[in-house]
Amino acid sequence: MSEPLLSVRNLETYYGPITAIRGVSFDVTEGQIVTILGANGAGKTTVLKSVCGAMEAQKGTISFAGRSVTGREPDWVARQGIAHVPEGREIFPFMTVKGNLMMGAYSRHDRGGIERDLDIVYGYFPVLRERQSSQAGYLSGGQQQMLAIGRALMARPKLMLLDEPSLGLSPILVKEIFGIIRRLNQEQKVTMLLVEQNANMALKTAHYGYVLEVGRIVLEGACEKLVENEDVREFYLGVKETAVRGKKRWKRTKRWR
């Protein structure tokens, strides 16, 4: 078996005295979309911030493409080929749309390649071409999410970290965004680590998944298997098994507890 593109082992990260994630281990295979599911506060964002260097992990190791990135600065990690699309998008509101996209290519020096990639981004997100001279702060929420993904794509990443791309978007826009995520994976060969509360959409999009609860991984498997798991169906997909006359007679707890 080939070495995973990203390998995280026994990761622990703290917020002061509070343990945010504890003993987290997982792999991301090159070419795949891997998702981490979990409720709000489970530690999903902390995992991504630890991987990209935005937060320092107190314990554990992070390896990317066979090289340790544990404890390195975010700009160094980004230059290795990891691009982060943060929760809440975090675009530069007073810069133009094109200016935001060019910020994604700040570490690149191949002008011709940058222009080609800009055309690729505009191909996936035509509205960004139409609004390229507008201030990014005037874009809608969905357009800002497209801009955040496009900005990450401009870095020509090997691995893209996506933090809650469905946050605050309408169901129609969520479907559009996740369709583009699948296309980027298939057509541009971008490996992705996706954290998402919308378990239904995440499991439809990803190849492999992990369930994170209270800072620890409690379940993993291929997504087509996870959607059949009784706990995942009830507690993350909202599908309940019913008893006689369509009513459940007891409140079941999760089997992994």
Protein language model features and the residues they cover:
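Glycine-rich phosphate-binding loops of nucleotide-dependent enzymes
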Residues: 2-257
